[in-house]
Amino acid sequence: MENVKEDRTLDLSGLSCPLPVVMTSETMRKMEEGQVLKVISTDPGFERDIWSWAKQSGNILLKVEKEDGKTIAYIKKASEAHEPSLWYWIKFHSLGVKLHIRQFCIQINPFVKKPTHFITFSAISEGTRAEKELKKLGEKDAVLIPIPDEIDPRCGVVLAVHGEKKAREIYEKLKDMDIAVEAIYEKKGKEYERVYP
């Protein structure tokens, strides 16, 4: 599939997560079945995000190209496509704002032990589910925050924990609950190193 003829182009250069996926979803929702949207993005996590979004929405990702630091995606509207509503994206964006504020509060509060270990998830929904399940169990040693760019530049969340022993304990507990945990990273200076599994 060398040449793909797009019906519409959406240049989202300069916008960061989650806006490229939100605007792509809203544009696709208004397109007709079979039409092709060309999306241009400079967000470093856009390629992985758009693959995931296409799979979830039922649209067809025809091809992805890299050119001059930009990711260019060609997406075909499928008949069975089901893009999330604008209300869904508003709730998603407000979650991001809430998590960034939470992260900032942890950083500036001198009375809180700073997290040293970070548990990653296969999806944001798994992270929010993990937080809810841990709250039910009375677990207060893990805080859901945005994933550091050094671990993954895409939109995502991590559970921030102080201490590797506690992080492993929570990781195993979540795994036993069938929550899609991926790994534990340890912060070492400005770097993050995968330490488990």
Swiss-Prot record:
SUPFAM superfamilies: SirA-like. Gene3D superfamilies: TusA-like domain (3.30.110.40). It holds the Pfam family Se_S_carrier. The active site is at 17 (cysteine persulfide intermediate). Belongs to the sulfur carrier protein TusA family. PANTHER family: SULFUR CARRIER PROTEIN TUSA (PTHR33279:SF2), SULFUR CARRIER PROTEIN YEDF-RELATED (PTHR33279). This is Putative sulfur carrier protein aq_1421. It comes from Aquifex aeolicus (strain VF5). The lineage of its organism: Bacteria, Pseudomonadati, Aquificota, Aquificia, Aquificales.
